[in-house]
């Protein structure tokens, strides 16, 4: 026999033999000794203030139970070592119990004392009190509301993730398998639970399994499981299909797709500039492939916008048909979130272009600022040029001040370009030429081997290019002194084809000997300068008109058809060209209240030469336009041969929407104005219209040569794209397009030569340099020639031809002897 005794606490007290009759259980005041299945005829009993658990196990057949000698057991117990240890631990146990009692009573005593000592203390009891909850069965309305609440939460989760329904189906399927298995187990006594669960699963996934059941109740259970299995299968199939469709939709939207590209160009926003930017980037990469400087066969472009992905894909597909050297990817996302640019791999991009998508100038600058701020937390953005189109020079300075980014703001001066091109014939063609990569464009290049060379040697030494100035410390100077020496950090600004730049870069051993400069004595230089000064007309120190070197500009009457927010800039630019007594009337269907804010802005600007008036009417209406022109005709008669100019501008909202609609409106208004003027016999000095699609303008001009269509939006788009390819050119174009900086002018050649002369282009350049101008080409017989080669051959120019120069409106005093 085996006996197991478990001791809990020890305070032994031996019982009398008379008390040993209770064999199954011995009880003391608070302790008990339990004996079970005592063998060998029983055991003598004893009592102690402790707890014993004695277990016995019979190992074989023995005689009936008998008593055990309690005295022998007690003597052995008293002599054992554990007994002595327990006796020694009794005082420690007493101390432990007292300390436990103190710890239990101390917090309550402290609370009572504090509550009694502080009259305003909280008198609440820390002991928990029953909450007295109503445990009655809920009403039907409560159950109904609970179910509705559960369905509501389930639907919310389902909207967030369609996979929630899949999880619910799996839970319901497992529940039916368990319930069906338990029912089969109840009615099938001979099968284990595992087989019953498998039978329920078979009925659920295969509807034919329930036909094999034998009893009635089993058939009912199998039938119910088969019906639910069919429902589960149909819902599971539809859920999986919907989940797949949902994932494919997310992939099509591209909002959460991580772009794994490098050396790609990111374009943010969609407006009328986009097709021209894509065209310019396609042309640049085409020439890069020909010159061998391209790193890939096609340039990857990532188009980002908050418009739906389907619309973006349609645009990309339409553009891809015309452009063979760019590959357009689309991504629909927010342009104000850092996560969007991180997923677009902005830190690995070649350049980032941010286009305006709003009509209001303040919204344009605000959105641009938020997009730039979203780029700031991204690491490694210091070397990535970010080209941002803004509408205000103040925003230009603000974006430039953002640290950690290489921001290159491009001010949208479409209104100024429109005025300049309408005042100077062929100026729009010159801009397009300088922005066409297949022709002569602006280039910036450093020549380490020519450090220390004087600017005059550089200006006259390169015979295949037109040297325009220097780029030093991030600022461009079109008029450096001839004695200025080229520094190591300087870059030379010149006009030349792209292939010439590559050819010169290959000449690593290029030295000063490559530059041929005529060596003249000081006396010869003095004589040449005096001879040239006698053949040119000197500029006044301060010119009051951009269109003429005279003190005052011409007096004209202008009819402006259309309205948008940048009319103020147009009026300011017109004021730089026109003389005193000029007038402008604006005809548009925009109310006077909406124009009043612009009128206040006009009042704040110093307009010296133009008097502005407003008329409300639709420029597309024949009668309204006729009345306006007749009123201008009467003013024209009273003004003693004051020239009349009719200009048409596009609404900004049309440009941001469908550009073709803006072109239709502008072309129709201009054709209608020409028809009315012909019927009334009104002589118009200039008929010009703003247009987006230059191809449409060429078609109409072919039919009506007297009309002029100016694609100012296209010019600004090409500037943005060129800055994206070379961010250093931003300073060049900023100075050229700025009203206060150097601009491109088409001036009469009679200012630079006498009748009967045949000077070379180099000679004309020297004469222009005396007027603090940079000659870049000429117009002969209506045909422009920029960067003519060779430059030393005589030119047969007529007095009505023109010279193309870069000049400033108010510069330093022209050079004199």
UniProtKB/Swiss-Prot annotation:
SUPFAM superfamilies for the chain: Voltage-gated potassium channels
Principal location: membrane
Membrane topology: Multi-pass membrane protein
Organism: Arabidopsis thaliana
Protein name: Putative ion channel POLLUX-like 2
Keywords: Membrane, Transmembrane, Transmembrane helix
Compartments where located: Membrane
Transmembrane segments: 165-185, 220-240
Gene3D superfamilies hit by this protein: NAD(P)-binding Rossmann-like Domain
Domain RCK N-terminal: 262-411, 555-716
Lineage: Eukaryota, Viridiplantae, Streptophyta, Embryophyta, Tracheophyta
InterPro entries: CASTOR/POLLUX/SYM8-like, CASTOR/POLLUX/SYM8_dom, RCK_N
């Amino acid at each position: 026999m085996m006996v197991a005794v478990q001791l809990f606490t020890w305070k032994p007290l031996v019982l009398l033999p008379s008390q040993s009759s209770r064999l199954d259980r011995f009880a003391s005041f608070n302790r008990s000794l339990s004996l079970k299945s005592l063998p060998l005829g029983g055991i003598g009993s004893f009592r102690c203030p402790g707890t014993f658990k004695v277990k016995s196990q019979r190992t074989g057949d023995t005689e009936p139970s008998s008593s055990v000698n309690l005295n022998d057991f007690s003597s052995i117990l008293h002599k054992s070592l554990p007994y002595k240890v327990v006796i020694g631990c009794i005082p420690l146990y007493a101390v432990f119990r007292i300390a436990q009692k103190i710890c239990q009573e101390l917090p309550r005593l402290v609370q009572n004392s504090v509550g009694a000592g502080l009259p305003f203390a909280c008198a609440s009891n820390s002991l928990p009190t029953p909450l007295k909850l109503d445990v009655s069965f809920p009403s039907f309305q409560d159950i109904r509301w609970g179910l509705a609440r559960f369905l509501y939460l389930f639907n919310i989760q389902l909207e967030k993730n369609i996979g929630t329904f899949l999880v619910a189906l799996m839970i319901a399927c497992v529940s039916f398998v368990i319930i069906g298995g338990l029912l089969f187990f109840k009615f099938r006594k001979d099968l284990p639970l595992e087989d019953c669960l498998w039978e329920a699963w078979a009925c659920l996934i295969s509807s034919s399994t329930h036909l094999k059941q034998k009893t009635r109740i089993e058939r009912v259970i199998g039938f119910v499981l088969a019906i639910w299995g069919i429902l589960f299968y149909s819902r599971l199939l539809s859920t999986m299909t919907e989940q797949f469709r949902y994932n494919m939709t997310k992939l099509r939207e591209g909002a959460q797709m991580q772009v794994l590209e490098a050396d790609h160009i990111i374009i943010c926003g969609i407006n009328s500039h986009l097709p021209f930017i894509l065209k310019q980037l396609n042309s640049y990469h085409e020439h890069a492939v020909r010159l061998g400087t391209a790193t890939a066969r096609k340039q990857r472009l990532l188009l980002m916008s908050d418009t739906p992905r389907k619309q973006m894909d349609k645009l990309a597909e339409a553009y891809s048909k015309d452009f063979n050297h760019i590959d357009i990817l689309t991504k629909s996302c927010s342009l104000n979130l850092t996560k969007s640019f991180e997923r677009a791999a902005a830190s690995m991009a070649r350049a980032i272009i941010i286009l305006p998508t709003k009509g209001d100038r303040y919204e344009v600058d605000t959105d641009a600022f938020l997009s730039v701020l979203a780029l700031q937390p991204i690491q490694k953005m210091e070397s990535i040029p970010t080209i941002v189109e803004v509408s205000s020079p103040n925003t230009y300075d603000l974006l430039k001040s953002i640290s950690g980014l290489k921001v290159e703001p491009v001010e949208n001066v479409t209104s100024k370009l429109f005025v300049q091109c309408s005042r100077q014939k062929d100026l729009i063609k010159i801009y397009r030429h300088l922005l066409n990569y297949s022709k002569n464009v602006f280039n910036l290049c450093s020549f380490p081997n020519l450090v220390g060379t004087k600017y005059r040697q550089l200006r006259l030494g390169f015979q295949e290019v037109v040297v325009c100035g220097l780029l030093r410390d991030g600022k461009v100077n079109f008029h450096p002194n001839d004695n200025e020496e080229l520094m190591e950090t300087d870059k030379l600004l010149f006009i030349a084809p792209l292939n010439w730049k590559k050819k010169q870069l290959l000449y690593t051993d290029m030295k000063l000997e490559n530059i041929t400069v005529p060596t003249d004595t000081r006396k010869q230089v003095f004589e040449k300068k005096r001879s040239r000064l006698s053949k040119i007309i000197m500029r006044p120190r301060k010119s009051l008109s951009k269109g003429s070197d005279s003190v005052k500009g011409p007096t004209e009457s202008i009819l402006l058809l259309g309205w948008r927010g940048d009319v103020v800039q147009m009026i300011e630019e017109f004021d730089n060209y026109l003389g005193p007594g000029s007038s402008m009337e604006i005809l548009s269907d925009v109310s006077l209240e909406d124009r009043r804010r612009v009128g206040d802005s006009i009042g704040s600007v110093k307009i010296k030469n133009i008097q502005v008036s407003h008329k409300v009417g639709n420029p597309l209406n024949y009668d309204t336009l006729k009345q306006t022109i007749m009123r201008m005709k009467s003013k024209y008669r009273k003004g003693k041969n004051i020239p009349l100019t009719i200009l048409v501008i596009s609404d900004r909202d049309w440009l941001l929407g469908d550009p073709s609609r803006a072109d239709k409106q502008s072309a129709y208004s201009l054709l209608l104005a020409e028809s009315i003027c012909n019927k009334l016999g009104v002589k118009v000095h200039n008929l010009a219209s703003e247009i987006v699609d230059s191809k449409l303008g060429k078609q109409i001009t072919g039919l009506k040569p007297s009309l002029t269509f100016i694609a100012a939006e296209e010019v600004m788009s090409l500037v943005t794209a060129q800055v994206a390819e070379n961010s250093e050119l931003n300073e060049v174009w900023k100075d050229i397009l700025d009203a206060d900086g150097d601009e491109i002018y088409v001036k009469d050649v009679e200012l630079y030569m006498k009748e009967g002369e045949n000077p070379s282009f180099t000679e004309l350049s020297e004469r222009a340099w005396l007027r603090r101008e940079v000659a870049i080409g000429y117009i002969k017989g209506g045909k422009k020639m920029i960067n003519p080669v060779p430059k030393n051959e005589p030119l047969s120019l007529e007095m009505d031809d023109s010279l193309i120069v870069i000049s400033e409106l108010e510069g330093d005093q022209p050079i004199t002897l």
